[in-house]
Amino acid sequence: MALEEIFPFIYGVRILYVNAFLLAEDEAITLVDSGLANREGTFLRALSEIKHSPGELKHIVLTHHHTDHAGNLAALVEASGADVWAHPLEAPIVRGTVPLPRSNPKSIMLKMLWPLVGRLSIYGRLAPAPVDHEVADGEELPIGGGLKVVHTPGHTSGHIAVLMPRHGGVLFVGDAATNILGLRPPLGMSTLDMAQAKDSIRKLGELEFETACFGHGGVLKGKANAAFRRFVEKLAR
């Protein structure tokens, strides 16, 4: 585990190749995404490192249902009693009332690699968990300093990013884009609709934020929205 302080009381928690984020500025702590399965102890240790107990984790915001982002959800809810917030298109999948959707890789290479994707826990088994609050595009949540929901479909149908208004705007991107060797679209083999995903990146480029935090890749701190706008221009070429 790597614990990174992004701003005072805002932390990134990296487990292998995926990031989640603890927002501890308010009395009720909020977690954005829950990371890879069977790693709930990692988050409990992270809470301990920042001098908090599991019971102080009150809210978990889920950007989407993939198990590298939702894998610890059920275990963390059991450990903390936290409420879960997710988009209505993700909620039935998280609850386990509908099956996990499958991507449709187009190229021969992706079709050959597809069985490996499940083994990497992108589409592996997801333990059912409650979703207490279904959120809508543009909704301002009464948690995490007033997080604003941005529906960013493409990677999954109900994928969301969330924007914190503090610190000049902090955008929690989820997998709407990645920041590995520069800004990039989400991974093609695990994205339901890449054209829609690129439209969502354009939507994010219209927002005002200074910092961007990604599910995969490093934090962009300082004029992150300008970097997104340059990325949007690159996608349009």
Predicted segments with their positions:
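Conserved beta-strand hairpin/beta-sheet module of binuclear metal-dependent hydrolase folds
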Residues: 1-50, 161-174
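Active-site HxH/HxHxD metal-binding segment of metal-dependent hydrolases
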Residues: 48-132
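Metallo-beta-lactamase
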Residues: 37-38, 123-132, 140-226
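Residue-level marker for buried hydrophobic side chains located in beta-strands
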Residues: 30-32, 61, 84, 170-172, ...
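Short, electropositive alpha-helical surface patch
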Residues: 223-237
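Short, structured coil segments at secondary-structure junctions
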Residues: 6, 79-80, 208
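Short, hinge-like loop/turn segments at secondary-structure boundaries
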Residues: 100-106, 191, 230-232
